[in-house]
Amino acid sequence: MDSFKQNAVVFDCAGTLVEMYRVTKSLKTGQVILDADNLKLISESPGSGLIIMDAPLDLIKNQPPERLLSEFLRSEKIPFGVAFAADGFDAGDISRVLLTDQTKMKSFLETNEEAISYFDDIIYEVFGFIVSSSENKITYIMSTGGKLFENAKDVVTAALENCDVFIASGDDYGNLNRVAEKLGIQKDNVIGLCNDVKKENIILELQNHYPKVIMIGDGLNDLLALNAADLGILISRSNYYTPENLMDAADNIVDDLGECTEILQSYLLE
């Protein structure tokens, strides 16, 4: 990797650069959870993992409602990744569960309609589902809508003055590249479909090339990366799930993205 600047900043995306509204549906009860916290849900469900589909939005939205999710993934050769998982989850179970699963695309279309109605200026639409290794089935499906935080552009622009800027996220590349383009982040510096271990490895790899590597995130799947970074900044908002072990992993805790600029500038001058 050729570095052009002395330092690197890695941003999570959803919840960090993008304000999210998540809609999650239980396939067991039919309950629809508005403004859901999927990482909290998974952390309280041993053996569960959040799977994100990396498919073009138009392709998903134009699917026949009665088409099976499993057939869609297989026939369209849709990549997917594990964004976050609780203890006891086995990624090898995903394909096995899909062999007999009867989840239909209409569930995603319905939750998507609800998710994108929350904001006027949507830039982010994510589709995913939760697999339970212990129950051997898909337990929830989810869709999210998101818009850039108002100060995201200013924070990233300030970081770019002294740092190479990266995005590392569990979400799909289509959404991440759209955000990167809006914020002036190089497409080559976008890494999607990351779980917590992959994020940590990204930090460790960057530390081979930069004297200082900073991680900015907000969720449980950022914990390992925050801990590994030379400086870890956690954004802990009142409506976000922030357990104690996540706070312990960070060097600084803020409640607004905009506070990161001053912390970055001060740290880089040390």
Which residues fall in each region the model found?
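Alpha-helical substrate-recognition element adjacent to the catalytic core
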Residues: 2-182, 189
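Structural motif corresponding to alpha-helix initiation and N-cap regions
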Residues: 149, 196-200, 219
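Hydrophobic/aromatic ligand-binding patch that stacks against planar heteroaromatic rings
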Residues: 157, 179, 205, 224-225, ...
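Acidic, Mg2+-coordinating phosphoryl-transfer loop and its flanking beta/alpha structural elements
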Residues: 165-173, 210-252
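Short hydrophobic/aromatic-enriched beta-strand-loop microsegments
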Residues: 185-194, 232-237
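Short acidic-hydrophobic, aromatic-tinged amphipathic segments that line or gate anion-handling sites
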Residues: 188-195, 251-259
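Donor nucleotide-activated moiety binding/catalytic core segment of transferases
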Residues: 192-212
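Short, charged, surface-exposed secondary-structure boundary motifs
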Residues: 198-204, 242-251, 263-266
